[in-house]
Amino acid sequence: MLRIADKTFDSHLFTGTGKFASSQLMMEAIRACGSQLVTLAMKRVNLRQHNDAILEPLIAAGVTLLPNTSGAKTAEEAIFAAHLAREALGTNWLKLEIHPDARWLLPDPIETLKAAEKLVQQGFVVLPYCGADPVLCKRLEEVGCAAVMPLGAPIGSNQGLETRAMLEIIIQQATVPVVVDAGIGVPSHAAQALEMGADAVLVNTAIAVADDPVNMAKAFRLAVEAGLLARQSGPGSRSHFAHATSPLTGFLEASE
């Protein structure tokens, strides 16, 4: 069971809504992966009516909506988008995204921290997308963010946990949930994140662009479950030396 702010989730796999060939395929994949929290970009939905092709099936499915501020380049733009989302969707949950460079889509640490502090003061449950910077993640936690969402690699790159060393530090020092976001390309990446101690992962591109998104969604669900179970089972420690699993000489001594 995963708890973030005032909500609990059975699934440790969060998903997005971008890049799917159709809203029907999107919903089939979401159901297949068992995600209970789904992020959506405010610029992609019709906020004036809930019969939007993306929004309507999500509301009907009863998943927790996590609107994001993707496209915002400054703290001011992100705060403006956050208020639009709260008014239109009736939720104070927000994935804070501020990335000024459209080529790399890397989060702006200064603007993110500035916006996060103000949004928390304004009553939002803030989950910030951020770089894998242990100092920044601790500062975001200190200003009241409900979780932190450090990247594994650039958005949509499918490179995996390129920031593993920093993620391990973030996880070790965090007192709020850590959700690894961005760059997860295959189910084994998700399993590794849960094994190392992450509370959840957010996966979008890897599922949406797969040849078979629904089966890929199932694969991610199983990988996340496996990674979490492995961590809870207490993996053995790593060693530079070999350790025999069976006696090497006992049978010789017994035959003498």
UniProtKB/Swiss-Prot annotation:
The top EC class, named as a word, is transferase
Question: Which reaction is recorded as catalysed by this protein?
Answer: [ThiS sulfur-carrier protein]-C-terminal-Gly-aminoethanethioate + 2-iminoacetate + 1-deoxy-D-xylulose 5-phosphate = [ThiS sulfur-carrier protein]-C-terminal Gly-Gly + 2-[(2R,5Z)-2-carboxy-4-methylthiazol-5(2H)-ylidene]ethyl phosphate + 2 H2O + H(+)
Pathway(s) it belongs to: Cofactor biosynthesis; thiamine diphosphate biosynthesis
**Localisation per UniProt entry:** Cytoplasm
- The active site is formed by 95
Binding-site residues, 1-deoxy-D-xylulose 5-phosphate: 156, 182-183, 204-205
GO terms classed as biological process: thiamine diphosphate biosynthetic process
Q: Does the keyword Cell inner membrane apply?
A: no
Question: EC number(s) for this protein?
Answer: 2.8.1.10
Keywords of the record: Cytoplasm, Schiff base, Thiamine biosynthesis, Transferase
**Gene Ontology CC annotations of this record:** cytoplasm
- List, in alphabetical order, the Gene Ontology terms for molecular function in this entry: thiazole synthase activity
Q: What does the subunit comment say? A: Homotetramer. Forms heterodimers with either ThiH or ThiS.
User: What function does this protein fulfil?
Assistant: Catalyzes the rearrangement of 1-deoxy-D-xylulose 5-phosphate (DXP) to produce the thiazole phosphate moiety of thiamine. Sulfur is provided by the thiocarboxylate moiety of the carrier protein ThiS. In vitro, sulfur can be provided by H(2)S.
Family label: Belongs to the ThiG family.
Name of the featured protein: Thiazole synthase
Q: What is the lineage of its organism?
A: Bacteria, Pseudomonadati, Pseudomonadota, Gammaproteobacteria, Enterobacterales
